[in-house]
């Protein structure tokens, strides 16, 4: 018996309605966007009306809209969150991405719930629990290797969502309390102050400086574009691009880049199918390196490697363009193959190791002119973090998404009939009364030409069949009107045919407690329980002791960050993977102004823990 192809989803970010529409245009199968409140990016909230408009637009292409409501909630916020969830459901949202298990205990509409990466999903046991209590998709921790992802997929059936591109949190998501402890701005409340991107000095127990003023907790950006097929074969169903604060150019370029890569795989792998309908065409060639990035890493893909960090800068480095060749006044030449343009932004690392940038004033042949001579020297690598010509292309309409449609034009006893059938099987038929008369010229070619004029619509004619009993005269005006009506009806039919997935409530029922036990018996502050309903959820699933969230009851001398990034390893002193021993005395500390952080190395679990020093 032939298996149904597995649905594969490209999931793009949107900070607002404009970004969301462009994500759809450029090939996203689904878009995730912030709720009006309670999203993990406090600066990326959206109105209900904008979310409604985005849902209407996406559903035309059978694409889905997931709304992020993935912060932990205070007791007094639960009623407002419940009301908002109903409003989001009525606006057309396809699913909610949540962190707080208290949400599962509210009076909810039948909207699917996705378990955010903030729920710390890194073991088969945790993912299986979420599956069994009713979550319909689970976002895995970014830190998981291919083998770990495969193991989870083999032991569960819930669709798995993984990040493939974008900024990396240095800590396990949902397990970072550094910002909350140092500033009162909690990452679990959507207000991360990004202490991980600051410059720190590394100091040993005797106060000796090992490294001075580097961004020692700053990671490169993830890029797993070359590994998509391996992820699909491991059991992943949703490929996620990070970036709910990124601008529309970023969303356009990165979405298109992954769409093209994914389409090439789907074209030769019939066991997988695209999750939405339509196809996109572009006015530009997508290049991931041309959008904001701190340098790329596949990030712990198969084994630990040294390529994950961005110690020199947390800013966008850009694409390599070559090295400085010859300097002359306010001009220079480059040894490299990239074509530079007037207005390009270039970056370089100065003699202090700091990132600097300058704007290209003009380019003449192979010589680049600047207004002021930057502090560059021969053989220095240069990068381009702003491509003027590329940005111009993206600032205009840069993609069209079309649904393939087949059209058939026939005569009947009363006039003419037009039928339209799109690629998903949606079909309409309309009849136009008309007093027929024989034509002097053949009409078939003009009928095909006029009916194919679908430019400003979501459709593209891939076939127009003319089947008339005689060569009747058909005015172009009549064809235009029938085409207009046909498009309107087909759009309406598609909207009516679209069916949202509905889910059963994620609630413990009588007798269900022991059947679906939570993998842990005791929850510390790491459980992020900030309201009574979340506590009730865990207790109903066999948890016997539940501590308050860090945000409710700040602790001293507890780990504030758990990270796979290890400074011992970065320095070459890892006792597991490296032979060299450190000449410095532990514990090590990170120092930034008045902030002092203590490091502890948990080699058994291959992670680094960070504490605040008083």
Q: What residue ranges belong to the model's regions?
A:
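Short, conserved active-site loop motifs that form the nucleotide-linked donor/cofactor pocket
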Residues: 94
